[in-house]
Amino acid sequence: TLGDHKKWGYYPGMIWAKLMCIILLTPVKVEGRENLEKGQSYVFAANHTSTYDIFIIYGYIGRSFKWVMKEEIRKIPFVGAACKAAGFIFINRKAMKQALHSMEEAKKSLTNGVSVVIFPEGTRTKTGETGKFKRGAFKIATEMNLPIVPVSISGAFNVWPTTRKYPIPGKLTMVIHKPIMLHEDPEHREEQIEEIRNIVINGIV
């Protein structure tokens, strides 16, 4: 499959996502790419207000990555097929054994600068507001000792809210913040995750 190779698992999807953004008249402004170190693997943690978040990150994050996403994404037309072809990791939240296996597969992907993208809220918001970040979403970062990169996406909820069947034209912004290492002490981790959430929220325009 496309996902069997770092290069071909990423670039076709990137081109596809950028073309979709151009065709659908949704220009994307990106800030903060200079915060990333070449060759370093990261765990990107983004807010999730719309299915369109997938197009924005896929097309404009500028890094080869695997996606950790919920099983339901498979069923979304075009999006699900492309993500499966790229070898992304689907999590079945209703089947813990399968979910743990998927997480192990995700960890194997984090080599040679390949990163992982997560939506710590676990699902799309129905209001446009950023929900609580779930601690389990950061498990890969703690086990692999990888830095978390908060990502703020703006405009996607207006372009494609849950109430609309299709997206509409609109301007989008993605801010890539400076990497953060999670604290080794679990007692401080909850506070740090909330700090990451606040960084994401403050970056939304």
Predicted regions and their residues:
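Membrane-interfacial terminal anchoring regions of lipid-handling membrane enzymes
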Residues: 1, 7, 11, 34-37, ...
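Catalytic core of membrane glycerolipid acyltransferases/transacylases, capturing the structured
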Residues: 1-14, 22-24, 37-96
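Active-site phosphate/pyrophosphate- and oxyanion-stabilizing loops and adjacent acidic/basic residues
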Residues: 18, 55, 138-139
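A generic structural signal for well-ordered alpha-helical segments
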Residues: 20-21, 83, 109, 141
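General small-molecule cofactor/ligand-binding pocket signal
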Residues: 29-31, 89
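Generic preference for hydrophobic
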Residues: 30, 44, 67-68, 174-176
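Residue-level "edge-of-site" marker
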Residues: 34, 96, 154
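Non-catalytic C-terminal accessory region of glycerolipid acyltransferases
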Residues: 100-205
